[in-house]
Every structure is written in C-alpha cells, then in structure tokens.
C-alpha cells in the first residue's frame, strides 16, 4: 500500500490550538476558533489542516504529554467539537491531520499509573522498564533518561524528552 495520491500535492496549514483563535474569552485558542477560520485557511490555498496535539494532557510539554488519547483537552473544547471540525473541514474538501504522539504518554495516563504498580498486571509491560534502578538506558537510541523512586514498582522507567513522558514499549504486542 503506497502513499495516498491526495497526499502528493496537498498544502497543510499547521495549527497549534492554544495559540489560535479563542472564541470563549479564556485566553486559550480552541477548536471552535479553528472551525470559524476554515474558510480563511481554505482561501489561503490550503487543502488541509495539521492539528498539533489536542488531547487531554497536564500540558507540561504543550500537549505532547497525552493523558487520554480518547478525550479532547477541555481547554480546547469537547470530542463533539472535534467531530464538528472534521465534518466542516470535509464539507469544504479539506483534510484533517491529527498530530499523534506514539512514543510516550504522560505520567498521568491510566496505563502508566497501572504500570507503576508492584503487582504484575496487563499494563506492566506497556512501558520501557528495567529492574535496575541505576540504568540510564544509554544503549537505547531514542531514550533521553529515566525516572525512578516514584512508585511501588522496583527499578526505573525510560523517558522520552522529559521526566513526565514515560516511553512506550514498542515490543509490547497487544
């Protein structure tokens, strides 16, 4: 399966929701603001929008520390707002690309909270853990450090970028 033909010539407009149009006066851009500006974006010659992370997050890293991939961050709106954005964009012949963060989650994600428990459970292996509390993961290319001493589980967990972003285990097949 190759690249879709529409992707060869599309022009995307990248949107960081927080700094886009604020429609409710709280000082933070939101999905309704993006919906209001779809005609403007289309008039610029853009055929799609690339939406930076918009999911529930504690926002230690601008939303790249996702706590719930199934819920829009309340500061940006609701899941219904996101559905409306897709609908309105598609009505205008525009594509919507969501910025997915597949390498890590937030330490506040439910998977990670369960993974931190000393008792083995279905989430134990979803993150990159070692039983060696002093492991620095230098032999793993994309790992930038580790976090330790914060849970009932022995050892430490690898992180991507910041200490609030535990690395997901790509070797976990489920």
Feature names for model-found ranges:
Residues 2-173:
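Acidic/aromatic-lined carbohydrate-recognition and catalytic surfaces
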């Amino acid at each position: 399966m190759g690249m879709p033909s529409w992707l060869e010539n599309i022009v995307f407009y990248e949107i960081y929701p927080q700094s886009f149009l604020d429609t409710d006066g709280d000082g933070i851009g939101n999905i309704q603001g993006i919906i209001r500006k779809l005609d403007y974006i289309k008039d610029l010659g853009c055929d799609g929008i690339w939406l930076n992370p918009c999911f529930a997050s504690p926002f230690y890293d601008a939303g790249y520390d996702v706590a719930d991939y199934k819920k829009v961050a309340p500061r940006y709106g609701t899941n219904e707002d996101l559905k409306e954005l897709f609908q309105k964009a598609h009505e205008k012949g525009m594509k919507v690309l969501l910025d997915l963060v597949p390498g890590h989650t937030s330490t506040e994600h439910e998977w990670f909270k369960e993974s931190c428990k000393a008792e083995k459970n279905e989430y134990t292996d979803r993150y990159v853990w070692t039983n060696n509390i002093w492991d620095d993961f230098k032999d793993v290319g994309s790992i930038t450090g580790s976090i330790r001493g914060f849970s009932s589980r022995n050892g430490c967990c690898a992180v991507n970028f910041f200490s609030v972003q535990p690395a997901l285990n790509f070797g976990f097949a489920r």
